[in-house]
């Protein structure tokens, strides 16, 4: 199945292709921040089997009403095995997962249990810095995502680029 990726503005394209560990995309209402984050998430979740991602927002009803709605507009239904809105978990047919989290009641003990490959915090300005740092520390804790063989063939020194010595992901 082909996934069509469209960019509404140059900033979306820069964000989508960025290889930096932490990315921020700011701007006015309706400029496509959530949309491009969801596009990028679908690509990561479907490319790497077993990939784990957390989508967060301060309040769950806002996450469900906005971010989740945008994600499911973009992600083809054929990729989804199960989605439990009440539990906040989406499982893909390739074993990848999304944890849908509200951060207004997040505590350190709960956050320490997450092992994820990446994190999207929608409306990050609503989130306390201490919670952001706690969630950010969980990124990279899950090492069971499977790198597709064509990528390994193309980049045999994965995850390091032989010229730059930098991580490719």
Per-region residue spans from a language model:
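Phosphate/NTP-binding elements of NTP-utilizing enzymes
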Residues: 1-169
